[in-house]
Amino acid sequence: SVGFKAGVKEYKLTYYTPEYETKDTDILAAFRVTPQPGVPPEEAGAAVAAESSTGTWTTVWTDGLTSLDRYKGRCYGIEPVPGEENQYIAYVAYPLDLFEEGSVTNMFTSIVGNVFGFKALRALRLEDLRIPTAYIKTFQGPPHGIQVERDKLNKYGRPLLGCTIKPKLGLSAKNYGRAVYECLRGGLDFTKDDETVTSQPFMRWRDRFLFRAEAIYKAQAEPGEIKGHYLNATAGTCEEMMKRAVFARELGIPIVMHDYLTGGFTANTSLAHYCRDNGLLLHIHRAMHAVIDRQKNHGMHFRLLAKALRMSGGDHIHAGTVVGKLEGERDITLGFVDLLRDDFIENDRSRGIYFTQDWVSLPGVIPVASGGIHVWHMPALTEIFGDDSVLQFGGGTLGHPWGNAPGAVANRVALEACVQARNEGRDLAAEGNEIIREASKWSPELAAACEIWKEIRFNFAAMDTLDPLKS
């Protein structure tokens, strides 16, 4: 019959289209779908496509006022997950017209909005997105990128060294500044506000900024190296955040920091635009990420949060360590590290990358390895992350038995030894401990660090692991 027909019909009749050929301009998504018992995988995949695009639970007469074929999401493929019962990877294509240009906020509101509470699904996880080049070109991306940062700092050929100041809460502004100065003069490139430090009663933000600036200028003058401190500009409102960034620029500080998930993508993108316009580097902390990404069958993988950050804008982002105290398998971590740094990444399921991604010269982001690392980890970190990284030792600097500056010296000596050994052709993975021992003969600071942390390990199985590849 002609006209509107009320009622409920199966999603798969409209949104499951295995014959669909994807377009270069489509946003492609890979969802890990766990249907409720009795729900066919095709219906579950189609439901995801519908609820994250144009669909609702019943037929509505206003469907006739638009072209659903033009705007609907389509589930174009489903494959079972090897080794899992009743779990599937559903591939969904979204037309580009569904998304506002230059808005990570709108992209995520559409793709991972209501659908994650859908009753027909027991669990749902977004594993990867292919962002088309046409959409990427609507984003500014990182304020500066890797090469511009190296040029600003005049530091080449090695990873950069950082340190989060501890205790993270409770220090006065002056004592915090003193700790910053000690670390920077000892040989670190950066120090960092803890992500929880904003403007609390024990240390208001303006005092914090002033004492950090004093520490940076004093520490730069002694060795003649450019230094930085990640001043956390995160605040309760966007206006307050921008006020703090403006003050950092007025003080001549080279880098500010933002907690991009708790602060939100809209605030982050605004800050990234300001940083590019005003010559500030932008360090990004990922506080709250594990709430979203740690469970294997529900939520969103961190590689998506990393891609979104590259689009929204940030020059550094925390990316796990592989060897420290925080979650992260080596292959998975290297997969999203490449997505952050490289211009073109081929799909590679052995590293969790579902789609080939072309960034069309969007600047890269430097991954930051931070969390439970110390001098014995330096060879592995240098080998895993390479030169374009920040290796950040908080307790691994401040916990040195002789104090902050000797802790910084120990880390710098260990790093320089590893870089020299690598450049001479030595195998860091096989000879790492020997390289550190040799260097410690010439550095009493490194020898003391080696002694105190020789037995420290964080040996726990990762929650988020790769699926077995199909034979």
Curated annotation (Swiss-Prot):
Entry annotation: catalytic residues: K166 (proton acceptor), H285 (proton acceptor)
Post-translational modification: The disulfide bond which can form in the large chain dimeric partners within the hexadecamer appears to be associated with oxidative stress and protein turnover.
Modified residues (N6-carboxylysine): K192
UniProt cofactor note: Binds 1 Mg(2+) ion per subunit.
Residue positions binding Mg(2+): K192, D194, E195
UniProt subcellular location: Plastid, Chloroplast
Positions of the record's site feature: Transition state stabilizer: K325
UniProt-listed Enzyme Commission number(s): 4.1.1.39
Protein name: Ribulose bisphosphate carboxylase large chain
Native species: Anthocleista grandiflora
